[in-house]
Design a protein with these regions (language model features):
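A short acidic, Gly/Pro-enriched loop at the edge of an enzyme's catalytic core
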Residues: 111-120
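C-terminal helical/coil "lid" or tail adjacent to the Rossmann-like core of SAM-dependent
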Residues: 2-29, 209-261
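A short glycine-rich, Lys/Arg-flanked "PGG" loop and its adjoining helix->strand segment in the class I
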Residues: 133-148
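Conserved catalytic/acceptor-binding region of the Class I
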Residues: 148-219
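Conserved class I S-adenosyl-L-methionine
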Residues: 1-48, 62-66, 70, 86-89, ...
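A short SAM/SAH-binding and catalytic strip from SAM-dependent methyltransferases
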Residues: 119-132
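Class I SAM-dependent methyltransferase SAM/SAH-binding core
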Residues: 54-56, 60-109
Length: 261
């Protein structure tokens, strides 16, 4: 049975070998108005109120770059991530900016001063953090009074039936090779469902307004390309052997073909 350290190493290895994969996927998933999850998250920012912004788990710096361009370099931006490989890509991307980048876990941000950010953002990484309470404690410490913390997280697995079907196809192949995979998931399971996350946030931010908003995103492609891209949503798919990965992609492709009306 994998330990917490094993899971963290798995997470780091996936990002080391697949730098920049998160934005490649997320950038193509859009709502009915054509907005992706980065657009939706950045909508919470107000340049008159949010001068100092922290991106937790900034990865390759995609959202920092987007934010810097959208606000014409007028915000003081900082990013932290556990992956040195992702941060190396971020430094190249943000080379000609004043954006600060640090390698650290979200639970260990002692180098950031109390009440130093008006806004803290986290894109698609909160459910991977464990333990999560210290993350919220840290956010509360470094967030200014009347500041805002906003995150994009995975939706409840049962919100969209198609998502659950895809999950089951991928895990079928993963558990054939690693029977115990999934017995312990990456991160804190409470951050993967809205009810538990809401209660946890209320406990951590007792003096703040807490809201969770469901938002459905879509990704359209031909079945073969869709199978390849959708598999990248799941960290589990990265542990498969070449043979297993190929079989999984074919199964996903056939599933999508069967859904074409």
């Amino acid at each position: 049975q994998p330990s917490h350290a094993d899971l963290l190493d798995h997470l780091k290895l996936v990002h080391q070998n697949n730098t920049g994969f998160t934005e490649k996927i997320a950038n193509n998933c859009k709502d009915k108005f054509g907005k992706n999850s980065y657009d939706i998250l950045l909508e919470v920012l107000d340049k008159k109120k949010h001068l100092n912004v922290l991106d937790i788990a900034c990865g390759s710096g995609f959202m920092l770059d987007l934010c810097n361009k959208r606000f014409e370099g007028k915000l003081n931006l900082t990013g932290i991530d556990i992956s040195l490989a992702e941060l190396e890509l971020a430094r190249k991307k943000l080379n000609n900016t004043e954006i600060k980048l640090y390698q650290s876990q979200a639970q260990k941000l002692e180098f950031l001063m109390d009440k130093s950010f008006e806004a803290i953002l986290c894109h698609w990484a909160l459910p991977l953090m464990d333990p999560i309470e210290p993350v919220f404690t840290t956010i509360k410490r470094i967030l200014k009074n009347r500041g805002i913390f906003a995150a994009i997280i995975d939706g409840d697995i049962n919100t969209a039936p198609e998502y659950l079907n895809i999950h089951n196809i991928i895990y079928k192949y993963v558990q054939q090779e690693y029977p115990s995979y999934g017995s312990i998931e990456l991160g804190d399971l409470r951050a993967r469902n809205s009810i538990d996350l809401y209660q946890l946030a209320l406990k951590s931010f007792s003096d703040a307004k807490v809201s969770i908003i469901n938002h459905l995103l879509y990704f359209s492609e031909n079945p073969k390309a869709l199978a390849r891209e959708v598999a990248g949503f799941f960290y589990a798919s990265f542990v498969l052997s070449v043979k297993g990965h190929k079989a999984m992609l074919l199964d996903l492709e056939n599933y999508f073909l069967s859904r074409i009306e």
